[in-house]
Amino acid sequence: MSSLPDWRDEYLASIKEAEKNSPVNRDLVEACSQLQDRVAALEAERDALKASGASAGQSASDPASQSGDAAQSAVVARLRLDLAEALGTQERLQSRLGLAESELERLRAKTAEDAKTIRTLNTQCVSLSTKVKDRNEELQGKSKLVENVQDELIALTLQLNVMEQQKAKIQAENDQLVERWMKRMGQEAEAMNLANEPKFAKRG
């Protein structure tokens, strides 16, 4: 009895191992496994028929035996056809599986690239958030400084108003003092003139 080529066993084993690590395309892998079993069964049946046909040809040569040989040949031909079809189907499924695995690798690469992009964007977001926070704190500090300056200006304005009022009050008091002094000086001058009038009259 002949066995399947080693590359088929190794290929199927590698597919099953990959399926354990990453369970994708399970239907394709199962179909390949079933075809592998079918091919093995067909080859075993073909070998058994060949062996039985060879022994029958050695033991009998009558027409009945020849008819049996013809029937066995037809069965062998059918088995060969089935085997060829099974192998063709297996190759097509293996091709589909290869394409699916290639697509999976492409998607994995894209997923890894997307994850890298997301990490980069997250880093940028954290950096921008930190900058915005720092700028807000800076603006709050400047706003507080502006408020302090405004409060100081208000206080200085109030002090200036008080000083202006005091200045006006002092100016008014000075004006009153000057006015009273001038009035007093005028009264004293008039009194002196009145006192000196008799003296001027006697001299005349």
UniProtKB/Swiss-Prot annotation:
Which cellular compartments is it found in?
Preautophagosomal structure membrane
**This protein's GO CC annotations:** phagophore assembly site membrane
- Gene3D superfamilies in the cross-refs: 1.20.5.170
Q: How does it sit in the membrane?
A: Peripheral membrane protein
A matching Pfam family: ATG16
InterPro entries hit by this protein: Autophagy-rel_prot_16_dom
Superkingdom field? Eukaryota
Residue ranges annotated as compositionally biased, kind Low complexity, are: 51-69
Name the GO terms of the biological process aspect.
Answer: autophagy; protein transport
Q: Which UniProt keywords apply?
A: Autophagy, Coiled coil, Membrane, Protein transport, Transport
Coiled-coil parts of chain: 24-183
The record's region (Disordered) falls at 50-69
The family annotation for this protein states: Belongs to the ATG16 family.
Q: What does this chain do?
A: Stabilizes the ATG5-ATG12 conjugate which is necessary for autophagy. The ATG5-ATG12/ATG16 complex is required for efficient promotion of ATG8-conjugation to phosphatidylethanolamine and ATG8 localization to the pre-autophagosomal structure (PAS). Also recruits ATG3 to the PAS. Involved in endoplasmic reticulum-specific autophagic process and is essential for the survival of cells subjected to severe ER stress.
Give the record's subunit note.
Homodimer. Part of the ATG5-ATG12/ATG16 complex. Several units of each may be present in this complex.
- Name of the molecule in the record: Autophagy protein 16
Q: Which organism is it from?
A: Pyricularia oryzae (strain 70-15 / ATCC MYA-4617 / FGSC 8958)
Gene behind this protein: ATG16
